Amino acid sequence: MELYLDTANIDEIKEIASYGLVDGVTTNPSIIAKSGRNFREVIKEICSIVSGPVSAEVLSTKFDGMMKEALELVEIAENVVIKVPLIPEGLKTVVELTKRNIPTNVTLCFSSSQALLAAKAGATYISPFIGRVDDTSWDGMELISEIREIYDNYGYDTRILAASIRGPMHLKESALRGADCATMPHSAFLQLFKHPLTDIGLEKFLEDSKKLKW
């Protein structure tokens, strides 16, 4: 399973990348706006740190605008993936970008029928928002299962990128239900390392190590 960071914070990306555990990065306009920096400069710097896919979202909601922005974004680096919202104009853009062999990530997916449309359009990735689905009192993990079954039934190559991951349980369930990859904020990524028994065991090892001669 591939693990992505959902952030535009350069320090956070450098930290996790230094562990050799991050496969890519996802961004969106809201995340980049928090940095207060130029959109393209941020994407360029991220691509220089991470060799895997870096999702950069178009800002327009119209086909012509999305195509123009997408073609400009892919010139930044070869690992840029064009992120588009799951709207009719967005999927129209995905169809055209797919013809040009430009990878795409369809975002803001909240239903299996939406995921089916994205796959038919040729999306490289589909990003179901697990945490936000849970917030509506529906089961976000069931959405992953439904998408996995539909894609397997019809042989779609679109990869399931579980998004809105809020902690280890979300990641575990996404992995068990067949998501190909998952993206999460820096704070959630750090939670993956944590377990109380690990802390207890480490404390014991460190205590006993004081008795050893090196």
Swiss-Prot record:
What EC number(s) would the UniProt record show? Answer: 2.2.1.2
Spell out the subcellular localization from the entry.
Answer: Cytoplasm
Write out the catalysed reaction.
D-sedoheptulose 7-phosphate + D-glyceraldehyde 3-phosphate = D-erythrose 4-phosphate + beta-D-fructose 6-phosphate
Q: Give the residues annotated as active site.
A: K83 (schiff-base intermediate with substrate)
Gene Ontology MF: a single term: aldehyde-lyase activity
A Pfam family found in this protein is TAL_FSA
Q: Return the GO cellular component terms, semicolon-separated.
A: cytoplasm
Primary site of residence: cytoplasm
Going by the UniProt record, its keywords in alphabetical order are: Cytoplasm, Pentose shunt, Schiff base, Transferase
Its BP terms in the Gene Ontology are: carbohydrate metabolic process; pentose-phosphate shunt
Q: Does the keyword Transferase apply?
A: yes
So, what pathway does this thing act in?
Answer: Carbohydrate degradation; pentose phosphate pathway; D-glyceraldehyde 3-phosphate and beta-D-fructose 6-phosphate from D-ribose 5-phosphate and D-xylulose 5-phosphate (non-oxidative stage): step 2/3
Role description: Transaldolase is important for the balance of metabolites in the pentose-phosphate pathway.
Protein family: Belongs to the transaldolase family. Type 3B subfamily.
PANTHER family per record: FRUCTOSE-6-PHOSPHATE ALDOLASE 1-RELATED, TRANSALDOLASE
Q: What name goes with this protein?
A: Probable transaldolase
What is the organism field in this record?
Leptospira borgpetersenii serovar Hardjo-bovis (strain JB197)
Q: Recite the lineage of the species.
A: Bacteria, Pseudomonadati, Spirochaetota, Spirochaetia, Leptospirales
| Gene name for this UniProt entry | tal
